[in-house]
């Protein structure tokens, strides 16, 4: 088995209201069951998720946090506005967002945007992936999957990798439970993070900084599905999330 990862070249700087599906189709002829992987930054820009830092007024909680961690209270307020729980305050803010994604700074980006502005992530990345996928299918006449990605750190390793934050017509997790291993033993715990693995592969071509390519197409890896899927299928249930439990205990001890 083999598959291709194709960087879609000549994607221009994206602004509010830009037609991403048309731009993608203009620069690459899509094929049936392609997986279109798109950086959340350009999805957010097209959706107008750009805000001036000077327009944000910090509240009491943001001001208190700023006094403890030395960050700009306006930036903290922006993070809090997108968060339902703060797990770590410093040296960075680790939060669970309103959408259920656990990440640094609620996914708010200060890079790849003009000074003095903040780029918020898509409000509902599954919905963004769905809109993008449906429009791409209409334009191309092909059956397609879409993954919206962001770069995430890892809890126990240095460095960032691509991670899926929104999906369309692709199952995010492959369950191997019940299958047999090389020695005939039945697998009892085996779940493969397909969407994250594909996001990581795409991130190798996307790159970072000024040379970034925000759209990559995976071709030849057929994981298309007709049913509706959601990124929350990848989130660990609260009762199983020992890292969050540990961070909450640590917070209580600090308080």
Swiss-Prot record:
Protein residues bound to GTP: 11-14, 40-41, 45, 112, 206-213
Residues reported to bind a divalent metal cation 2: 151, 208
Enzyme Commission number, as recorded: 6.3.2.31, 6.3.2.34
KW Nucleotide-binding (keyword) present: yes
A Pfam family per the record: F420_ligase
Enzyme class name: ligase
Positions that bind a divalent metal cation 1: 109, 150
Signal peptide: none
UniProt pathway annotation: Cofactor biosynthesis; coenzyme F420 biosynthesis
GO molecular function, one term: coenzyme F420-0:L-glutamate ligase activity
Catalysed reaction equations from the record: oxidized coenzyme F420-0 + GTP + L-glutamate = oxidized coenzyme F420-1 + GDP + phosphate + H(+); oxidized coenzyme F420-1 + GTP + L-glutamate = oxidized coenzyme F420-2 + GDP + phosphate + H(+)
Note on how the cofactor is bound: Binds 2 divalent metal cations per subunit. The ions could be magnesium and/or manganese.
InterPro entries: F420-0_g-glutamyl_ligase, F420-0_gamma-glut_ligase-dom, F420_ligase_CofE_arc
Biological processes per GO annotation: F420-0 metabolic process
Assembly behavior: Homodimer.
Matches recorded under NCBIfam families: F420_cofE (TIGR01916), PRK13293.1 (NF009809)
Family the UniProt entry places it in: Belongs to the CofE family.
HAMAP family: F420_ligase_CofE
Name of the protein described by the UniProt record: Coenzyme F420:L-glutamate ligase
Organism: Methanosarcina barkeri (strain Fusaro / DSM 804)
Gene, per the UniProt record: cofE
């Amino acid at each position: 088995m083999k598959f291709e990862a194709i960087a879609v070249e000549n994607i221009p700087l994206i602004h509010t209201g830009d037609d991403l599906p048309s731009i993608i189709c203009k620069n690459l002829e899509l094929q049936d069951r392609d997986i279109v992987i798109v950086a959340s930054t350009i999805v957010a820009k097209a959706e107008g998720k750009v805000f001036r830092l000077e327009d944000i007024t910090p509240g009491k909680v943001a001001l208190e946090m700023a006094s403890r961690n030395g960050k700009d209270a306006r930036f903290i307020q922006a993070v809090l506005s997108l968060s339902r729980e703060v797990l770590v305050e410093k040296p960075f803010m680790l939060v669970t967002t309103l959408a259920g994604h656990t990440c640094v700074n609620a996914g708010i980006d200060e890079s790849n945007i003009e000074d003095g502005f903040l780029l918020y992530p898509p409000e509902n990345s599954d919905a963004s992936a769905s809109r993008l996928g449906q429009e791409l299918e209409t334009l191309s006449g092909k059956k397609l999957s879409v993954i919206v990605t962001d770069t995430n750190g890892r809890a126990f390793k240095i460095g960032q990798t691509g991670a899926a934050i929104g999906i369309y017509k692709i199952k995010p997790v492959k369950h191997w439970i019940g299958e047999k291993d090389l020695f005939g033993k039945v697998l009892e715990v085996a779940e493969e993070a397909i969407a994250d693995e594909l996001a990581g592969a795409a991130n190798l071509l996307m790159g970072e900084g000024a040379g970034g390519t925000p759209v990559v197409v995976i071709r030849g890896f057929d994981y298309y599905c007709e049913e509706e899927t959601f990124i929350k299928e990848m989130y660990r249930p609260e009762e199983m999330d020992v890292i969050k439990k540990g961070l909450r205990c640590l917070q209580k001890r600090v308080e």
